[in-house]
Amino acid sequence: MMNDKDLSTWQTFRRLWPTISPYKAGLIVAAIALILNAASDTFMLSLLKPLLDDGFGNSNSSILKWMPLAVIGLMVVRGVTGFVSSYCISWVSGKVVMHIRRRLFSHMMGMPVSFFDQQSTGTLLSRITYDSEQVAASSSSALVTVVREGASIIGLFIMMFYYSWQLSLILIVIAPIVSISIRLVSKRFRNISKNMQNTMGEVTTSAEQMLKGHKEVLIFGGQKVETERFDAVSNRMRQQGMKLVSASSISDPIIQLIASFALALVLYAASFPSVMETLTAGTITVVFSAMIALMRPLKSLTNVNTQFQRGMAACQTLFSILDMEQEKDEGKLEVERAKGDIEFRHVTFYYPGKDTPALNDINIHLEAGKTVALVGRSGSGKSTIANLLTRFYDVSEGSILLDGHDLRDYRLGALRNQVALVSQNVHLFNDTVANNIAYARNEQYSRAEIEEAARMAYAMDFINKMEHGLDTVIGENGIMLSGGQRQRIAIARALLRNCPILILDEATSALDTESERAIQAALDELQKNRTSLVIAHRLSTIEKADEIVVIEDGRIVERGVHAELLVQQGVYAQLNRMQFGQ
């Protein structure tokens, strides 16, 4: 779970302001429109005095003639300013959400693999979607309410003091009480909002796990377990929502109760003869109407605090991610195409938060153009070696050299351009077959090159059977393809990149025997003149490796070629007998 920095609301808003400020022109236009909108309401109310005192009281027909035109004019102003303010605020809000999401997305892409290993996908998706929307709410809806209702309150106060300053002074007494009430509930709102955002991440994670693993849920009868899990997180979300509603609902009647006392005091004060002498029917109507009209903006300002605090809590959550250090890329060394000589020197590695090393004093030399296979039981540390070679993680002790230079001396982009990776967990994008093969480099390769890579990976036989061939959209993570077909697309991607270093992380594990034989020929061709690190589950695929390294509990326990290791009758020979049933 991420730790949110304990920033005050003001400090949080100050950090948010640089995101909003580029669009301040829209905010200024919206603010002017909102003030004019509020002013039109105030002027509409002020028309009551001349209407009652002169129009009806003194039978002044001229007032009755221009009054309808004034009402129509004010309503036109109100309608136009309402449209302008809504449009400008929506424009600013959309820009702010887009900016925050882009910044968050870009920052997450630069985070180390360890960050994603420690966070659930659902929680991160909730940060990009739900939390970003909450921030927009604090910078749009809250702003509308504060400016419009604030202008209304100021306008109503000015009008009240203009007509009867004696009665209006009573309202000044309740202002500090209202302020204290709002402050008391603000902290409560912020804490509940933080909990709601965390719970929303849990809801998203629970739903995502069920959707992605629905086949496993069905085959293992996990419907009850998943339903109970989802019910639990949904109920926590409901409870947090009810706490928020309770806090908000309590604040409303408190404000109204305070206002009712103020109205009662005004009525009492108006009964004094010295005050009554200064009042007319129009004056008392306008003052009382203004006091009642103040209830709505006061209530709105109280409610906006809920949304504003929710947005500020979301800001703190997002800032906690943006404050995390991105993947270190301090290397300066550039290389167009490496020779591919790789050496692990006394490499020890601990996963973050672990006391036991995943790898302990690993020494491996992969000569350029040679193939080294890593063999061992599940969890022995084979894939960790591949993760270190690509610098998904950095070594804890020791060093890894590429062509005599420490991997950390290379710029990350330059280093990873030297490596093609085919793993057992193939990820494909919801795009065409061709775009998946040429992923991120569509403009670099011709159609003929893409097709040739697919042919060498023995993928064209099933691609040609698709409705649109290479232009067929394969769905999210290649849902329309079988496991073997997805693996062949990944191999075609590696063939097309033509990198000097190749990592095969159980690349044929998802293939049937016939497909494996077909693709093994392509892999043999792919490995020629390339430094290959092969992590093997099927030992038959690595019998021709230049060296086989056996890993056990993060240590190298055996090394040699296939025939030598069989003669030693050690761990490799035991694994071989288990696999072939000897």
From Swiss-Prot:
ABC transporter domain ranges (all copies): 342-578
GO cellular component: plasma membrane
Compartments where located: Cell inner membrane
Entry keyword DNA-binding: no
Pfam families: ABC_membrane, ABC_tran
Enzyme Commission code(s) on record: 7.5.2.6
Span of domain ABC transmembrane type-1: 28-310
Entry GO MF terms: ABC-type transporter activity; ATP binding; ATP hydrolysis activity; ATPase-coupled lipid transmembrane transporter activity
A single BP term in Gene Ontology: transmembrane transport
Function: Involved in lipopolysaccharide (LPS) biosynthesis. Translocates lipid A-core from the inner to the outer leaflet of the inner membrane. Transmembrane domains (TMD) form a pore in the inner membrane and the ATP-binding domain (NBD) is responsible for energy generation.
Quaternary structure (record): Homodimer.
Domain notes from UniProt: In MsbA the ATP-binding domain (NBD) and the transmembrane domain (TMD) are fused.
Family: Belongs to the ABC transporter superfamily. Lipid exporter (TC 3.A.1.106) family.
PANTHER family for the chain: ATP-BINDING CASSETTE SUB-FAMILY B MEMBER 10, MITOCHONDRIAL, ATP-DEPENDENT PERMEASE MDL1, MITOCHONDRIAL
The protein, known as: ATP-dependent lipid A-core flippase
Organism of derivation: Yersinia pestis
